[in-house]
Regions:
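A short, flexible loop at the N-terminus of ABC-type nucleotide-binding domains that lies
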Residues: 1-4, 13-26, 57-64, 82-85, ...
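Short catalytic/signature loops enriched in Gly
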Residues: 3, 147, 240-343
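Conserved ABC ATPase "signature" region
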Residues: 73, 77, 128-148, 258
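ABC ATPase NBD coupling module
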Residues: 77-95, 121, 243-248, 279-285
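Conserved ABC ATPase signature
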Residues: 152-157, 161
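A short, proline-enriched helix->beta-strand linker immediately N-terminal to the Walker B motif
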Residues: 172-176
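P-loop NTP-binding/switch modules centered on Walker-like glycine-rich loops
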Residues: 179, 183, 187-269
Length: 343
């Protein structure tokens, strides 16, 4: 597949009163045209900061993108852009669906004008043509009676409807890349499923590449082609959805999968959780970031960052357990164990 986006050694820090927070520490991954890539991990792992860097939304100060970081979009290094180039890129080439539609939409403008504004900023069309396009977009995302809804304000819509409006705004200029940052936040389970299904249908219909940011592996099971697992500002594993769900190679990925609630739990059986807390990113650990919480940690994990080991079909993981000299008995997530994690 043809490459659309390449993130290479991305490092982002934020200056605070307590010190410099190293939010993203050497993140690298790719997105191909027409592909959906999910970026998953716990809160604070750097998922949203990575997406903001791709959109050019890191404010400096307090944010800082470190030298040596690169983000290539169609072979152009976005980090060399001037502000006018960013303005042309945002919305037209790459759009973003933000976490909370209620706070992301302008409460003083009706939803029609908010969509029209995005269209007229990037396309040479009249306001009447933009209004017709706005109605078409509302219909596309499944909002009934779009000609009437276009006059309504955000507070007059339900949470699910507001999120559909956010998707319509993001798709207004037919971008090549759509970033969905926790698009199901604050929505009930049935509406979550509808929004994820809508994004999947639109991706297939329009051929748009999608980056889906989430902490819930259950959300990405049926939509993502590839999954990038982040922890403590780093990518610890990435591969196809099938590899991540059935052949995970990193203890953190395995722990995330074990923590997904199952429908076949016995009565009063406790849910699985990951013990401990993520490390402080003001003073991140020198070795593996997951070492303090990992049940299989070794001495080398505490002192030396693990290399990235490559497996079949682009599957890779950063874990010392894959070193040729490491014993691998009873490790269900290590290749050769013959066991699979249930989806």
């Amino acid at each position: 597949m043809e490459q659309l986006l390449k993130v290479e050694n991305l490092r982002v820090s934020y200056h605070s009163y307590a010190g410099k927070v190293q939010s993203v520490r050497g993140v690298s991954f790719e997105v191909n045209k027409g592909e959906t890539v999910a970026v998953v991990g716990e809160s604070g792992c750097g998922k949203s900061v990575t997406s903001k860097a791709i959109m050019g939304l890191i404010q400096c100060p307090p944010g800082e993108i470190k030298e040596g970081s690169h983000i290539y979009f169609e072979n152009q290094d976005l980090l060399s852009f001037q502000e006018k180039q960013w303005e042309k890129y945002r919305g037209a080439e790459c759009s973003m669906i933000f976490q909370d539609a209620l706070t992301s939409l302008n409460p003083t403008m009706n939803i029609g004008n908010q969509i029209i504004e995005n269209i007229t900023n990037h396309k040479n069309v009249t306001k009447l043509e933009a209004k017709k396009e706005a109605i078409r977009l509302l219909e596309l995302v499944g909002i009934p009676e779009p000609a009437a809804r276009i006059k309504q304000y955000p507070h007059e819509l339900s949470g699910g409807m507001r999120q559909r409006v956010m998707i319509a705004i993001a798709l207004a200029c037919n971008p090549k890349l759509l970033i969905a940052d926790e698009p199901t936040t604050a929505l009930d389970v049935t509406i979550q499923a509808q929004i994820i299904d809508l994004i999947k249908q639109l991706q297939q219909k329009l051929g748009t590449s999608v980056i889906l940011i989430t902490h819930d592996l259950g959300v990405v099971a049926d939509i993502a082609h590839r999954i990038v697992v982040m922890y403590s500002g780093k990518v610890v594993e990435q591969g196809s959805s099938e590899d991540i769900f059935y052949r995970p190679k990193h203890p953190y990925t395995w722990a995330l999968l074990k923590a997904v609630p199952r429908l076949d739990l016995q009565n009063k059986q406790q849910l699985v959780s990951i013990e401990g807390m993520p490390p402080d990113l003001i003073t991140p650990p020198v070795g593996c970031p997951f070492a303090e919480r990992c049940p299989h940690t070794m001495k080398i994990c505490q002192t030396t960052p693990p290399p990235t080991y490559h497996f079949e079909d682009g599957h890779e993981a950063s874990c010392w357990l894959h070193h040729p000299q490491c014993r691998k008995e009873n490790l269900p997530f290590v290749a050769g164990g013959g066991q699979e994690c249930q989806k």
